[in-house]
Amino acid sequence: MNAIDLFSGAGGLSLALQESGFTILMANEINERFAQTHKLNFPTVPLIMKDINSVTAEEIRALIGDVIVDLIVGGPPCQGFSVFGKRRFINTQDYDPHQDPRNFLVYQYIRIVKELRPKFFFMENVKGFTNLDKGLFVEEVKNQFRALGYNNIWCEIVCAADYGVPQERYRMFMIGNRLGIDYEPPSQTHFPMGTGKLPEYTTVGPAIMDLVGKENQIPNHVPLIHKPIVEARYGYVKEGCKLNVNDLPPELAVATRRDSKTGKVSNYSHVFKRLDRNRPSTTMVPGHNAFPIHPTLNRTLTAREAARIQTFPDSHIFCGTRQEQCIQVGNAVPPRMAEPFLRKIKQYLEHEEEMK
C-alpha cells in the first residue's frame, strides 16, 4: 500500500506511515529547514519543496508514475483554526474563517485529493477546526470531499494519551474514503489514572528521565541557557504546577519583560509550568520559549526531550537551530498517535484488495 504526505513537516506522519507498513511515494513541504529534516530521515522519499498552491498533479505524477494512490495524508497549517491563531484578530467575534488566508491551504489539500483520487484520505488539524463558524466550516470541508465521491467520512477529536503518547494533546482526525467503507477507529489503548482501567496513561518520567546527565551527548539534546533570574524563578515552580507569582521573593518578582504593565512577572501558563513525572505532559507548543519546565531541573525541555514526549525515536534527527528544532517538534503529529489509525486504513485497503 502506498501513500503521499502533504505538509510533511519534520515527518511525524511519514514516520507513522512507515511504521504502519505504507510505502511513501512522495512528500511536500514548503519550509526549507523542515524539508531538510524530512530528507535526512527519509532519504529515499522524493520531496517537492515548494508552496502547495503551485504543486500540480502533473508534477506529482512525474515523480510517482501512474500508480494508484491508496492514501493521502496531511495536516494543512492550522494557525487560523487555533485559539492562539484567532487571537491575532482584535475582535474574534468578527472572525471569518473563510477570509483568513491561513485557512486556504485546506482547500489546496482538497484540490490534490481531487486530482489524484486516492482511495482514502487522512487529514489532521487542531481541535478548534471543528468549532469554527459554529461548526459550519468543518461541514463545508466535509461536503467538498463528499462532492468528490468521498461519502464515508469519520471525523473526531482524538487525545494522544489514549493511544500511548505521554502527552494530553488533542487533534482533529478526519478520515474519508470513496470505497463505501464505514471507518471504525481503533480501540483506545490507554486510560486516565484513577479509572481502574489498564494500562494507564503513559507518563513523562519513563519518556525522558533517562536523558538527565546526557545533555549535549545525543542529537538535539541541548539545553537552553536561561538568564539567572529566570532559572531562579523556575526553582519556585513545584513539580506538576504552574508558577504562583506570590511565592516569589521581591527581587524575583520584578518584571524583566518590556510588555509588563504591572511591573511584576506574569504567569505565562505555557512558560512557567513544570511537568510531573507521574502524569502525561501538556501539549508541546511549538517554539523553544514555549516548552514546559523539566520535572526536576530548572530549565525548559530540550528539543530531544520534547521529541521523546512526541514519541519520536532518538534516531530521528531535527535540523537547524535550537529554535527551529523546537518548532519542528512542536508542530509535528505524534507518530504513535497517528499510527493505529493508519494501520486501520491499511487493513481496510488490504481487505478491499482481497475482495477483487
Regions found by a protein language model. Name each.
Residues 1-3:
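Extreme N-terminal starter segment of soluble prokaryotic enzymes
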Residues 5-12, 66-88, 120-125, 174-178, ...:
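Conserved proline-anchored active-site loop of SAM-dependent methyltransferases
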Residues 10-20:
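Conserved SAM-binding loop of SAM-dependent methyltransferases across substrates and taxa
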Residues 24-25:
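Short beta-strand element of Class I
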Residues 31:
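Conserved SAM/SAH-binding beta-strand->alpha-helix loop
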Residues 224-356:
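C-terminal target-recognition/interaction regions appended to catalytic cores
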